[in-house]
């Protein structure tokens, strides 16, 4: 007896159940989980439709490059403006000072160097062997003192005055009082003082006569005045009077230091 009902008829093939091939969605870095309520912002910023691309990725300059680009012209402009203000201020100061003190002319008398100062001091102390006393000119303008030992200068007189004050103050300070002191007398007494004073007086007299005499003669020749004219003779007498007054001034400034 054949079973009926669930039995399959003869000749009919049986169906086999294969496992389900449904693909499980894999979460990608750029896609959000459908079961997640909020986006995960802890990872790198997304570049999808909602993300904004960075300016540098599109070829536009970033904020740092823009600052560097703008800083260079601004600094150059500020530097140029400051330099122009400094130049204008210097020019204004020079104009105001030149009204009272000819600074441009005074610069000539201070254009000296160490070699010139050494040679000029030697000439002041030993003027007897010097032969050429003429001042050198270049295009009708006297050369700077550092190029000509005969050129006049104000550096040595200024430094001599400052040195006198310093040495006199030192000598007075050794006496523990500000009246009465000694300079040369500290070492050699009055005899040494008078010997040095006599030598300096004669040297400065010879130096001034030889230097100023040529200056007066050159000026007289330029003006067309006769050398033995009354005006030129008056200049020579005044020069000799100024030279003769130097020893008197030297003694008056130093005699109280050897009392």
Curated annotation (Swiss-Prot):
Q: Where in the body, by tissue, does this protein show up?
A: Highly expressed in brain. Expressed in heart, kidney, and lung and lower levels in spleen, muscle, and intestine (at protein level). Expressed in serotoninergic neurons (at protein level).
Source organism, top-level taxon: Eukaryota
The compartments listed are: Endoplasmic reticulum membrane; Golgi apparatus membrane; Endoplasmic reticulum-Golgi intermediate compartment membrane
Task: List all topological domains (Extracellular).
Answer: 175-186, 259
Q: Does the keyword Transmembrane helix apply?
A: yes
Q: What is the lineage of its organism?
A: Eukaryota, Metazoa, Chordata, Craniata, Vertebrata
GO CC annotations, alphabetized: COPII-coated ER to Golgi transport vesicle; endoplasmic reticulum; endoplasmic reticulum membrane; endoplasmic reticulum-Golgi intermediate compartment; endoplasmic reticulum-Golgi intermediate compartment membrane; Golgi apparatus; Golgi membrane
* Spans annotated as Disordered: 1-61
Q: What does this protein do?
A: Functions in endoplasmic reticulum to Golgi vesicle-mediated transport and regulates the proper organization of the endoplasmic reticulum and the Golgi. Plays a key role in targeting to neuronal dendrites receptors such as HTR1A. Plays also a role in primary cilium and sperm flagellum assembly probably through protein transport to these compartments.
- Stretch forming the signal peptide: none
Q: Which residues lie on this side of the membrane: Cytoplasmic?
A: 9-153, 208-237
How does this protein lie in the membrane? Multi-pass membrane protein
Query: At what positions is Phosphothreonine found?
Result: 12
Instruction: Indicate the quaternary assembly.
Output: Interacts with HTR1A (via C-terminus). Interacts with ABCB9 (via TMD0); this interaction allows (but is not essential) the ER-to-Golgi trafficking and strongly depends on a salt bridge within TMD0.
Q: Which PANTHER family match?
A: PROTEIN YIF1B, YIP1 INTERACTING FACTOR HOMOLOG YIF1 PROTEIN
| Regions of compositional bias (Basic residues) in chain numbering | 14-24
Residues found modified as Phosphoserine: 64
**Family assignment from sequence similarity:** Belongs to the YIF1 family.
Keywords on this record? Answer: Acetylation, Endoplasmic reticulum, Golgi apparatus, Membrane, Phosphoprotein, Protein transport, Transmembrane, Transmembrane helix, Transport
Write down what this protein is called. Answer: Protein YIF1B
Membrane-spanning intervals of the chain: 154-174, 187-207, 238-258
Q: What Pfam families does its record include?
A: YIF1
Report the residues modified as N-acetylmethionine. Answer: 1
**GO BP of this protein:** cilium assembly; endoplasmic reticulum to Golgi vesicle-mediated transport; protein targeting to membrane; protein transport; sperm flagellum assembly
